[in-house]
């Protein structure tokens, strides 16, 4: 395996280290959470075998897959008080069924398929940390420095839901973005009649198809009030079905986050 080449910064050799932070928690059925959950109230994973993210404005529902090797460590609920009280006794080893000896910490455990459920929220952060050879006091200080640099914008590279999880090793979870919920919202019977995007999707609009999904129509799309033409809808169709069908006519729907992280459905033509 070829090692990464060092780069020179301020006369010192540095290595770019790719960092990841994956947050997994129970979804709120009423709203789509914008802020990250407290790390003491979710699963936190900082190591994986591979991450693949497929993201394009030409698809409403984008996807991601994450693979975890045997022995991947998950951080579970743990408080600073626990750490202070337990001290050095927080580190111990555990022998797995296959004979592997794993070092573990109180509040941490190795990943198991049962840790992941369909419908859970997942947020993936990726970024680079430049290793300048600095010596840190402890692992916590090093982790904080790495994440401060790697995730400086604090913008996730993927935000969505778990839709499938393998039961074998390595563990692999399949995910879909925040538009995934639109596959569970059926439309109303309509037409044939002429409609606009605002009629169908705008909050307070005539049909308001996004109501109850946690998503709203992007203000910039609402300003344009795009004319769809004459359409007919049946109750067996979902909102995702309708928005995806528009792709055939060069009208694309995709998720776009505002500066504060609020997710919107944006609709527009390609030119």
Q: Which residues make up each language-model segment?
A:
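Surface-exposed cap/loop segments at beta↔alpha junctions
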Residues: 67-69, 73-85, 95, 100-216
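Short linear proline/tyrosine/threonine-rich motifs used for host-factor recruitment
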Residues: 7, 13, 76-77, 90-95, ...
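Short beta-strand/loop turn elements enriched in aromatics
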Residues: 40-83, 87-88, 92-93
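Short beta-strand-centered interaction patches in the first periplasmic/extracellular domains
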Residues: 2-5, 13, 134-153, 157, ...
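Polar/acidic, low-complexity leader/linker segments enriched in S/T/G and N/D
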Residues: 1-49
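Hydrophobic beta-strand residues in large extracellular and virion-surface proteins
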Residues: 7, 20-24, 51, 64-66, ...
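Surface-exposed or flexible loop/turn and strand-edge residues in extracellular/cell-surface modules
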Residues: 61-63, 119, 228
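Acidic surface patches and DE-rich sequence motifs
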Residues: 9, 26, 36, 85, ...
């Amino acid at each position: 395996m070829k090692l990464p080449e060092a780069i020179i910064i301020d006369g010192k050799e540095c290595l770019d280290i790719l960092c990841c932070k994956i947050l997994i928690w129970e979804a709120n059925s009423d709203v789509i959470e914008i802020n990250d959950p407290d790390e003491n109230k979710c699963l936190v994973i900082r190591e994986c075998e591979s991450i693949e993210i497929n993201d394009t404005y030409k698809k409403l529902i984008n996807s991601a897959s994450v693979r975890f090797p045997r022995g991947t460590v998950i951080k579970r609920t743990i408080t600073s008080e626990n750490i202070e009280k337990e001290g050095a006794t927080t580190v111990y080893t555990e022998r797995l069924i296959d004979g592997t000896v794993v070092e573990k910490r109180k509040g941490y455990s190795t990943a198991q398929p049962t840790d992941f459920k369909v419908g859970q929220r997942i947020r993936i952060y990726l970024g680079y940390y430049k290793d300048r050879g600095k010596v840190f006091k402890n692992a916590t200080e090093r982790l904080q420095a790495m994440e401060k640099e790697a995730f400086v914008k604090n913008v996730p590279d993927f935000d969505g839901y778990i839709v499938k999880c393998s039961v074998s090793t390595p563990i692999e979870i399949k995910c879909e973005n925040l538009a995934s919920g639109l596959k569970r919202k059926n439309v109303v019977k309509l037409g044939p009649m002429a409609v606009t995007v605002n009629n169908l999707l705008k909050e307070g609009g005539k049909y308001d198809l996004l109501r109850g999904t946690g998503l709203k129509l992007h203000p910039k799309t609402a300003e344009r009030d795009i004319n769809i033409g004459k359409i007919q809808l049946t109750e067996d169709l979902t909102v995702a079905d309708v928005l995806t069908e528009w792709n055939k006519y060069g009208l694309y729907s995709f998720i776009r986050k505002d500066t504060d992280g609020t997710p919107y459905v944006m609709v527009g033509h390609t030119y």
